[in-house]
């Protein structure tokens, strides 16, 4: 079950500030011209042992004041449909506005948890002013200061009440979600795979397809493919369609075993792509990167290798993710994409024995032991895979607190080199022995 927390409210109430506070990330994931914090509308958060995705609706509202108002109301409706819990933000220093009343009217009619967040309660006087928001009929307001973090702990305690427990479930049939930015070719790939016009590929709002799971068989292997390429009925504003599609995609990401993340070869890897990869990694999903529209790229003998090298450099720590070049339009390598995704699933669910880990990793550690810290030598005695669905490798040693990040990266690289872990998130833990 996906946990989606949507922040709604009129402009300038502090939605983005609260978003940054909850996901605890203040800088862009990729420092390039195409990827800045402007591209980041959703992020991973965890509290009280529960994981959830926070969506900042402010990132989807653009244009004139009339578009603002229409979009805000529309997004409130979408959030009601798709989110686990809605955070409705208001401004203590401004008080109740006509726009607040309009959004509150929509939210009151919803059969969905709504938490009224009274922001900018930076001192006792403004916190007392939060009581006026009782008039909105949405229960007790939560006075907070998103800027300083005051009150956000109590708010998060209540948010997690409405979130499902984070339990990794091992499934018999792999579930694969096709994700990516608008117009990268998700629908074209799905239609090419299925041989039918299952997803709507026109930009016309007024047609609808809900995200659905369907079981398929390829080369004798069953898998579930999640179709996230849907357009919401009656949506008239472009940003609303994007917001709706994003919520659906985020739910699909959380429910999937493997995420196929598609990018456009003519645009390359952009900030939103890296953010999506990072989110999938944090949720411990298998990942495959598809470079679509490869037919539009002028090529020579080195194009493929150079393009792949550039992407791997941009991915940094995620450079182990398999990359496949396809053309959904011309059906080039589309079935290889599913084969590769199933391969990632096999990598993710493989059972690595303790004996194999120790036979492989202890000689590696002996050749290059952990550097001493403060004159103290770290001795790793044995290695074991913990009984989790996604690989968690435990290193038992005398001084686990002194193992430094560069050495952890070295160990992860050696694990990936010696075991089939391409596209798989691997967690390393160090325990006292």
From Swiss-Prot:
InterPro entries per record: G_ENGA (IPR031166), GTP-bd (IPR006073), GTPase_Der (IPR016484), KH_dom-like (IPR032859), KH_dom-like_a/b (IPR015946), P-loop_NTPase (IPR027417), Small_GTP-bd (IPR005225)
Keywords of this entry: GTP-binding, Nucleotide-binding, Repeat, Ribosome biogenesis
GO BP terms, alphabetized: ribosome biogenesis
EngA-type G domain: residues covered: 3-167, 174-349
GO MF term set: GTP binding; ribosome binding
SUPFAM superfamilies xrefs: P-loop containing nucleoside triphosphate hydrolases (SSF52540)
Domain KH-like positions: 350-433
Binding site for GTP 2: 180-187, 227-231, 292-295
Residues annotated to bind GTP 1: 9-16, 56-60, 119-122
UniProt function note: GTPase that plays an essential role in the late steps of ribosome biogenesis.
Stated name of the protein: GTPase Der
Organism: Amoebophilus asiaticus (strain 5a2)
Gene: der
């Amino acid at each position: 079950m996906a946990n989606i927390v949507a922040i709604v409210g009129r402009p300038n109430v502090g939605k983005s500030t609260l978003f940054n506070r909850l996901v605890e990330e203040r800088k862009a994931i990729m420092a390039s011209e195409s990827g800045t914090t402007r591209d980041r509308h959703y992020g991973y958060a965890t509290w009280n042992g529960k994981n959830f995705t926070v969506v900042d609706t402010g990132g989807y509202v653009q244009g004139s004041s009339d578009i603002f108002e229409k979009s805000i109301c529309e997004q409130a409706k979408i959030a009601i449909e798709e989110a686990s819990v809605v955070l409705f933000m208001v401004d203590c220093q401004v008080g109740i506005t006509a726009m607040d009343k309009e959004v509150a009217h929509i939210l009151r009619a919803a059969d969905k948890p709504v938490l009224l967040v009274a922001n900018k309660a930076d001192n006792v006087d403004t916190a007392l002013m939060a009581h006026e928001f009782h008039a909105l009929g949405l229960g007790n307001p939560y006075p907070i200061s998103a800027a300083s973090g005051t009150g956000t702990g109590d708010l998060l305690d209540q948010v997690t009440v409405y979130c499902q427990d984070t339990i990794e479930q091992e499934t018999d049939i792999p579930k694969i979600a096709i994700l990516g930015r608008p117009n990268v070719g998700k629908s074209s790939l799905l239609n090419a795979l299925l041989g039918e016009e299952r997803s709507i590929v026109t930009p016309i709002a007024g047609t609808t397809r809900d995200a659905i799971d369907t079981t398929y068989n390829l080369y004798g292997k069953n898998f579930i493919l999640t179709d996230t390429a849907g357009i919401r009925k009656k949506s008239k504003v472009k940003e609303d369609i994007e917001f709706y599609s994003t919520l659906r995609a985020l739910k699909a990401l959380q429910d999937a075993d493997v995420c196929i993340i598609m990018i456009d070869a003519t645009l390359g890897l952009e900030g939103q792509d890296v953010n999506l990869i990072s989110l999938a990694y944090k949720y411990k999903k298998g990942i495959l990167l598809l470079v679509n529209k490869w037919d539009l790229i002028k090529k020579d003998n080195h194009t493929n290798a150079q393009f792949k090298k550039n992407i791997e450099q941009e991915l940094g720590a995620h450079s182990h993710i398999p990359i496949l070049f396809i053309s959904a339009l011309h059906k080039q390598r589309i079935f290889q994409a599913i084969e590769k995704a199933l391969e990632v699933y096999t990598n993710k669910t493989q059972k690595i024995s303790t004996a194999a880990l120790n036979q492989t990793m202890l000689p590696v550690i002996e050749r290059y032991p952990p550097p001493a810290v403060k004159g103290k030598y770290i001795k790793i005695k044995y290695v074991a895979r913990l009984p989790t669905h996604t690989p968690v490798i435990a290193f038992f040693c005398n001084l686990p607190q002194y193992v430094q990040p560069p050495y952890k990266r070295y160990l992860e690289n050696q694990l990936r080199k010696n075991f089939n872990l391409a596209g798989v998130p691997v967690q390393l833990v160090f325990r006292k022995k």
